[in-house]
Amino acid sequence: MSEILCQWLNQELRVSRTVSPKSFAKAFSNGYLIGEVLFKFELQSDFAEFSESRGSTAKLNNFSRLQPTLHLLGLQFDQNVAQSIITEKPGAATKLLYQLYIALQKKKKTGLTGLEIQTMQPQTNLRLQTLKSEAFREQRLNRRRQNEIMAKIQAAIIQIPKPESNRTLKAIEAQKLMKKKKEAEDVANEIKKFEALIKKDLQIKESVSKTSLETTDQTTAELLNTYSDDDYIKKIQKRLEEDAFAREQREKRRRRLLMDQLMAHEAQEEAYREEQLIHRLMRQSQQERRIAVQLMHVRHEKEVLWQNRIFREKQFEERRLKDFQDALDREAALAKQAKIDFAEQTLREKEIHEKISVERAQQRYKKHYGICAEILDQMLDLCTKVADYRLLTNNLIPHKMMHDWKELFFSGIPIYEQTSLTHGQTEPTEDHRAEVKKRNLLDSKDYEDYKNMVGEWALPEDMVNSSPPSNNSILGHVLLRLIEKADPSASNAEATELPSLAVKGCILGKTLSGKTTVLKSLQNDFPVHVLSIDTLVQEAIQAFHERQKSGKTPPTQEDDKRDPVVNQEKVSKTQDKNVLAVSPVPGDRTSQKEGVKINEFEQFRSSDSFLSLSMRAQLGAKSELMLRRGKSIPDILLVSILVNAIKEIPVDQSWVLDGFPITLNQAKLLEEALTGYKRKFLQLKKKKEQMPTLALDPSTSTEVSLLPSALDFVILLDISDNSSLARTNDIIAKEISHEISHENVGRPGTGTSQDNKSEDRNLRDHIQHRIVGFLDNWPLLEEWFTQPKNILTKVNAEIDEALLCQKVKEIFATETVNKKIKVEKTLEEKETEKKAGAPPAEPPAMSPPLSSEAEKDKELHQAKTPGKGKTQSVSPKGKAQGGKVSVKKSPVGSAEVSPTPTAPPPPKAGTEEWVYVNEPIPEELPSFLVPYWELIEKSYINHIKTVLRHLRERQHNVLSYLYETRTSFQEFLRRPDHKQDFVSQWQADFNSVPEDLWEDEETKAELHQRVNDLRDRLWDICEARKEEAEQERLDIINESWLQDSIGITMNHFFSLMQAEVNRFQDTKRLLQDYYRAMESKIPLEDSKKFTRVPLVQLDGKEISESQLRIPLVPRISNSPENSAVKPKVGTFLKGRSDPPLEVLEANFEIDEKILLDTWQQASLAISNMVAAEVHQRLTEEEKEPPQLDSKEKSPQSGANKKAKKEKEAPKKKKTDKKGKGKSSPVAEVSPVTVTPEEMAEMEKRNELRLRIKEEHLAALQTEEQAAQFRLELIKLKALSVLEDLVTKVIDVYRLMEKWLGKRYLNEMASIQKLTELARYHIETATKIQNEIYLSQEDFYINGDIKVFPDPSPPTRPPPVEREENGTLTIEQLDNLRDQFLDMAPKGIIGNKAFSDILLDLITLNLGTNNFPSSWMHLSQLDLQEITSLLTVNTEFVDWRKFLMVTAMPWPMALEDELLDTLQRFKALDEAQTGTITYEQYKQAGLWFSGDEDIKIPENPLEPLPFNRQEHLIEFFFRLFADCEKEPPQLDYTQMLLYFACHPDTLEGVYRALSVAVGTHIFRQVETPMLMAEKTSISTVSPIEEFPETEESSAKEDRELKEEKDDQKEEEIPENANTEKISMETLLKVFGGGNEVLDANRFASYLKSENIYAENFIKTFQDLGARNLEPIAVNILLKHPYIQDLIANYVDYKFPDIKMILQRSEHAQGSDGERSPSRLTDEKK
């Protein structure tokens, strides 16, 4: 059932936790999963309140919420069931879940919701459930109340310990004393023993240290002291001291006890004497006895009282001592805990500081990384943009574009377009703003280039000799005067103040950098006032609390100027509202008491008594209000408090600020409050903005001068963050130690200590924020104090305090000296200015007053310029007054005096020597002319920028169009054709011709004709494609793009000309109104007919002149002049003529003529306007003389007019109306007497009118020259742009023609190559196998595709093994193996039968090819000799060994290789059966592999070489495997024993032992007998009889000798041959002693028995192995029998059959009968 429920929960419901039957009870013990199941069935609506925790509260909550839902489903669920589930009772959760599963399935079938089920339930059940739940709830509440009452009762019970009896106490104390004594004795004995051992060790160490002193000195620094017994010795010594002290105390107590006993004894003696005396007195009367008894009783009571009082005093003393000791212990514990807490807090502070430092470093890194990434992106954008335009412009990027991109890159603006600047966009995005910024930057740069005539607008070669127009200084002066008249407040001169010797500065630094300490030291040595902002704020608040009244008069206007911030706060109500009337913040949790105080303050502030307070008290009130509201004091309020304090300091006294300002805003406010920096800077900036840019006044500078700083010096006490934290910790540590030391001593100064404690806590809490705030604000402050003038001095504050103070004092003394020198220099400059300015001030006082009051006002405002005019006009007046000349002589005298200064020529208008006319003008005129000029300037600049922007965009469009034209034409040339289809069809037909017809002449002729037809068809295709390409080029040329582009470009340049003409017209109008107003004339009416520069009409539509605002010029003129124009030879077309391009050039010349005509028209319009203005001046002058003739009827007026005309002659261009100027003296009939004053006034007016006219015309002519120059520049620029555009377009058209011709020639050449290839194959009568590819202009033979398959290559024959040097082939070996396996399956055969078989195979079966030819000449003696070499126990032969030997050559295995092969076989033999299959055999491999380097022959008909080693590996498995099993099994140990054979008999035995044991067995020392045997064997060697084998035998002997030498040299380790060997393994190694009658194939049932078994058993028993258990190899090898057996055992000797074969061949060769093998050897 549990599995069903788990499947239902995990798969169907998929609850949040996987449920298994083992953890079923635990999973549902908290009720969360039950709630989740009900929630999935929409029954548990409050499932969000369930908890997954396994706490008791969570379980109670979950099951309380589950109960009504389970009852709703009709399940039985109460406290017992819940407790069973909570306690994980087996089966409880399963039972409930099963019931829930059934109930939910029923609900699922009915389809009812939880609410419907609840409504369908009877009301009785619901009522019962509610009663049960209420009863349970009441029961829980009662139980809880009862538990609380019992807990209170238990807590109220006082546990009184039961006193112990005196006897038990004394016994326990006695036991404790005995125990302590015993422990002391034990410790003393141990100490004595330990000291004795220490002395011995020290003696030994001293003796050793003398011998190894040098090595100890070298290694002591490197070794670690892992164990030290100093602490242990100290503890023992301390304990000994304590024991000695205890003994002394015990002696004292014993002595005190003896003294007490002695005193008690004396008391007893005295009592005894008294008793004796009493007894004697008792003899007296009864009354005396009663008296004595009473006295004795009183005495006893007195004694008792005395003892009680002594006992109480002792108790009091013990209590005081205990309290004192407890206080000391408590203080020590508190100090220790405080130190621990302080260390932890310090560590936390350091961690927080390091974390903040890391965060700041990360922020800086991210910021720098972002900047670098942004720069890198912009560099990539620039590179890609350059690459794109190199592609567009053929690597010839225009200089203007590159310059614009560099500007954008240096400005950090993206080069690529972020978004399109549409006009309908209402809300600009970030990309939109970036595009607008980029556009504005490029527009401004283009405008500056145009204005300054640099860059793209630099003067061309034609205008290099002509000088550019100069600045119109007259217009600049006029505009400046108008601006000053319009804004007179900007020209008011400020009152200068006398410089002060007081030094002003501030000292800044991090928290606890030593600012206050340094200032205290500085204050002791210098008369300097220190201002601390914290102290000033506290004093201001205190002044408010004390209601300090203002004892000073109201501030004057000068004070208002010096301190605008304070006075604004004092006077302005709006600022009071902004600063003080702060609405309460909703998050502020102020108490009602604070609210009442704030309301009281508001009422007090609104009263009249608040205004009577001093300024400091008012500022303190505002500060307190901000602090009460939980806000910081604003910077402006702090600066006001500080400035108010500075005002109270005497002017000549120096002052220094302590730690202020700390932010840039505070520094700016302080600078503004002390110097008015911001107000003056804004005035200068506003004046600079109002300055005209098109015309400048050379006498005024537009640069904003930097104002001096309010401070003379700023000192930074530089310390590191760690030093600040360390100083904070030191202060807090001292405070903690001070608190602990004075905690219990009367507690003096509790309030002060509490304040210091709160300050230290506040310091510690805010030290991190203060440091971070300083680090954030200091870079801006450093820039503020070093930018205009470097007044900052950094001092390292981490040095000694006295040295730091000394450094600061030196800096202050230096600043004091510098300030004194500066003040003296300023005073000297002012004195020199006064002396120099005194003489020019006298002539105006001596000169007579002017005629009008306006000129007097002009004198007051412009003191210098009128002075020059007055000095010129004073001399004739002085002569007229002081000379007393008659009235008739005065004009003569003036006429005579005027031509006298002929040496210096009169200054020209606009030069530096020219004195500008500054006659008064109407007050309302500047208010009209200044906005009018601003409109002129703004419209001119915007017009120029817009046109230049369109020209810039036009350049981009031209490049894009030309690139698209080139690429589209190239794609058109590369459009696909159908030539390949014809070529493929021809190739298929050509290859399908039968081979027997290739040599037929008619066939060849037919094929040649087909080639000609193919060529003609391909030629037709090329011709058609060429005609289509030419038509496409002609269509591109005939497009109207070039004409439209030229027309648009011309219109842009015409717009530039229009802008210049408009500027000139507006400037002329402004100058005309200005000078006419100066002459008190009425301005002329505004003529609305402005000159319009015509534009080019782009489309051919005819529009009436009434519908046009701007005149249009038709594109192509129908006049005979345009039709007769011939193109200039060599202008654009070079080489052969091209009619379409000639038409383009003709159109360009027409456009060039239109451009020149338009320029000439604009230039002529400007000249006409100047001429009209001059004519108007002359006309007005002609009209004015009749008005003057009524007053001036003397002939001298004619002379004056002639003089005026002589002055005006060089200034005019046309002098056609001189007759009119001479008509005035004709009208004079009778002279009238004129007074000298009237004469002087008339002369002055005439001179003024002449100067106004001269200045006006000079300004107008300067503007005309500038406009004409600009028009000339625009004309040349337009011509160069249009010529460049036409040149680029014609180059593209020519390039298209070049591509077309080149492609056509390439296609024809490809067709020619194809024809030659086809004719070659026809003549050579060969097919074309590879595909011929002819597409577009490419022709080649595709070597990857063949149209018909190649003939199949011949198959290579299989490899065949050949006989070489008498070696048996693999086939021969397999045949011999099969025959021997049939005869002797066990591998052992009789030697007689073996030799007979070999003889029969050699002599009788000659056609079977069982042996090579070299074996056919073996005699019976040779075969018997071979048999004797293979004989085992003189009777049998191992035919497997024979086949292994005859299979040579194969690589002889070394002992290590055999062991490695054995380990690989064992690793694959997982069952350790000793056998493996063929697959495992191939996987493990032998010591040699069959992967030989086989050379594949080049001839495909030649077979591959035979891989003999690979076949040998397979043959060895067939040779040694047991084929009777399925699959065949190989005994790998037995096989490796065969391969252990060695030419050296002894070595072969040891190799076999190593293979059997599985590890290397070292050889024992050889005996002389063994050496003798080897010598005898070597003497029998037949090498001497056969000289042919001498060399090979000598080589083998040499190898054997080297191997023996190696074995001799091999060192035998001590633990060598310790491996154990068993009896079975030993019998397996020496298996040659098996007596087996295996002469025929029917003897397999016979049992084998080893002849060495009995001897081995005896050997094992001799060596101690009674039960024949395995023994060590080294022990076994020491036994004499084993040594003798190893020395004489020859089964592991590798027989040398090759020697017998060579001897047989040698014998045959001597008889003249050569074997086939020798013949083959000789041939080779």
From Swiss-Prot:
Record's function text: Required for correct axoneme development in spermatozoa. Important for normal development of the manchette and sperm head morphology. Essential for male fertility. Plays a role in localization of the intraflagellar transport protein IFT20 to the manchette, suggesting function as an adapter for dynein-mediated protein transport during spermatogenesis. Also plays a role in bone growth where it seems to be required for normal osteoblast differentiation.
Biased composition, class Basic and acidic residues, residue ranges: 558-576, 853-862, 1177-1194, 1592-1607
Organism for this UniProt entry: Mus musculus (Mouse)
Keywords from the UniProt entry: Cell projection, Cilium, Coiled coil, Cytoplasm, Cytoskeleton, Differentiation, Flagellum, Golgi apparatus, Spermatogenesis
Stretches of the chain forming a coiled coil according to its record: 170-203, 255-351, 665-691, 995-1021
Subunit structure and binding partners: Interacts (via C-terminus) with IFT20. Interacts with DYNC1I2.
Region (Disordered): 545-576, 828-910, 1177-1241, 1580-1618, 1704-1724
Superkingdom in the source lineage: Eukaryota
SS bond partners: none
Disrupted gene: phenotype observed: Lethality occurs at approximately 3 weeks of age, accompanied by severe hydrocephaly. Weight at birth is similar to wild type but subsequently there is significant growth retardation. Bone mineralization is reduced in the vertebral column and hindlimbs, associated with decreased bone strength. Bone length and skull thickness is also slightly reduced. Trabecular bone density is reduced, along with reduced trabecular number and increased open porosity. Expression of the osteoblast marker genes RUNX2, BGLAP/OCN and COL1A1/COL1 is reduced in bone tissue.
Biased composition (Basic residues): 1210-1221
GO CC terms of this entry: cytoplasm; extracellular region; Golgi apparatus; manchette; sperm flagellum; sperm midpiece
Listed name of the protein: Sperm flagellar protein 2
Region (Interaction with IFT20): 1228-1580
Compartment(s) where it occurs, according to its Swiss-Prot or TrEMBL record: Cell projection, Cilium, Flagellum; Cytoplasm; Cytoplasm, Cytoskeleton; Golgi apparatus
GO biological process: brain morphogenesis; cerebrospinal fluid circulation; epithelial cilium movement involved in extracellular fluid movement; establishment of localization in cell; mucociliary clearance; respiratory system development; skeletal system morphogenesis; sperm axoneme assembly
Boundaries of every Calponin-homology (CH) domain copy: 1-105
InterPro entries noted in UniProt: CH_2 (IPR010441), CH_dom (IPR001715), CH_dom_sf (IPR036872), EF-hand-dom_pair (IPR011992), P-loop_NTPase (IPR027417), SPEF2_C (IPR056199), SPEF2_D5 (IPR054517), Sperm_flagellar-bone_growth (IPR052634)
Cited PROSITE patterns: CH
Tissue spec: Highly expressed in testis, where it primarily localizes to late spermatocytes, round spermatids and elongating spermatids (at protein level). Found in Sertoli cells of the testis (at protein level). Expressed at lower levels in epididymis (at protein level). Detected in lung, brain, liver and kidney. Also detected in bone, cartilage, trachea, pituitary gland and eye. Expressed in osteoblasts and chondrocytes.
